[in-house]
């Protein structure tokens, strides 16, 4: 359940995929008023983290989805004064995620940029690393 979820990011094409799933998004630089119950910080940049604390309501939650490539200095005065809950999120528990996928409770197809055969895994990893695709799915055949 989510009252007011907002995902902050820096890539318009990635945020558009979330918009298609009816998820509210904002670019790091977009002017938005404070008030989100939950802000998912997915930029991996210090400016995105600071922006997340500006967007979340007092006593709201900031979910840190990505890590920064470099150590980040963090002014804790805003989250302390506003009693903001900070949650780290990496992969999460796999069993509930797999159950939700198998039951069709989560629509992931719009997030998959392409599907390739396992024999083309090396090229798929290179494509995924390029930053030009969201997710690449490897297909493992029974034969």
Located regions from the model:
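Mid-domain Rossmann-like dinucleotide-binding core that forms the NAD(H)/NADP(H) cofactor-binding site
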Residues: 1-30
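C-terminal hydrophobic helical "lid"/dimerization subdomain
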Residues: 12, 50, 95-143
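Short, acidic/turn-prone active-site loops that include or flank metal/cofactor-
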Residues: 11-13, 28-32, 67-70, 91-92
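Short conserved AdoMet
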Residues: 44, 57-58, 129, 133
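A short acidic, Gly/Pro-enriched loop at the edge of an enzyme's catalytic core
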Residues: 31-39
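Hydrophobic/aromatic beta-strand patches that form the interior of the parallel beta-sheet core
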Residues: 6-8, 26, 40, 63, ...
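Phosphate-bearing ligand-interacting subdomains
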Residues: 41, 45-47, 121
